[in-house]
Amino acid sequence: MTTVNLAAYRFVSLDSIEQWRPLVAARCNTLGLRGTILLAPEGINLFIAGPREATDAFVDYIRHDPLFEGKFADLPFKESLSDSQPFRRMLVRLKREIITMKKPAIKPELGRAPSVDARTLKAWLDQGHDDASRPVVMLDTRNAFEVDVGTFDRALDYRIDKFSEFPAVIEANRADLEGKTIVSFCTGGIRCEKAAIHMKDVGIENVYQLEGGILKYFEEVGGAHYHGDCFVFDYRTALNPQLAPTADVTCFACRAVVPADAQQSPLYVPGKCCPACHPGDSGTPGRRAEPGAEPARAV
């Protein structure tokens, strides 16, 4: 049976998340959905999967149920299909932030960061500058192991291990951004939106976020100006520019991304180890995920 995978987020001030949590969990369980929904004072971040009938019912629920006071009435969802259920269980969690930066929570009511859509960005990259003739710099806001799976051509990559390091590396590298148009990007939009808001707040000019992230870019224009695939935080591991799962897998032991060629190594033992963590091996490391990372933890 085909499984529908949905991802969505929104920065919006929420005051009733403690009340919502058990009700949302009960509805998801009744529908037979699996995945993770994060609720925080600054908004919602969700990754869920299930049969088409169940996901359609959830979208109708989150957009129209009076419980949510219309806060998600026009919430956009990103959809992809898979042959199996990528999640093991259904979780609804309360968090301080929907994506952890360890800075004061953003104030959604003050407005979101400026954005650029996929087609406009492709046009900028095709011509080598934006509509004001400023050079365009692509800024990858993801963790280093995600970047290693694929990223935009010539993107800035500061090799962060977790998103909470982002403010410090931006402060240390402001000179890279001066006089340019900065387009922050991530998997699905949430990190690059928060990153763009932070840069705007600290006085960096001409900052945009890529609307909908890499996955929306793939959906709209394919893989133009992008090399590799896109890491995703579920059991598909990575998607190609056609939004199809790749042959990459995640090592059971160390969470490294193991591409197809590395799976042929005698050091790769499914469910046990890979070339990045095989005992006593000092060969080519895999693309290691953050220790303890969970599927559906961030986009």
From Swiss-Prot:
Protein name: tRNA uridine(34) hydroxylase
Domain Rhodanese as annotated: residue spans: 132-226
Catalytic activity of the protein: uridine(34) in tRNA + AH2 + O2 = 5-hydroxyuridine(34) in tRNA + A + H2O
Classification lineage: Bacteria, Pseudomonadati, Pseudomonadota, Betaproteobacteria, Burkholderiales
Active-site positions on this chain: 186
Species this chain originates from: Burkholderia pseudomallei (strain K96243)
Biological processes annotated in GO: tRNA modification
Annotated gene: trhO
Biological function: Catalyzes oxygen-dependent 5-hydroxyuridine (ho5U) modification at position 34 in tRNAs.
EC number assigned by the record: 1.14.-.-
Any one GO molecular function term: oxidoreductase activity, acting on paired donors, with incorporation or reduction of molecular oxygen
Signal peptide: none
Family membership noted in the UniProt record: Belongs to the TrhO family.
Keyword terms: Oxidoreductase, tRNA processing
PANTHER family assigned: RHODANESE-LIKE DOMAIN-CONTAINING PROTEIN 7-RELATED, THIOSULFATE SULFURTRANSFERASE/RHODANESE-LIKE DOMAIN-CONTAINING PROTEIN 2
Keyword Lipoprotein part of the UniProt annotation: no
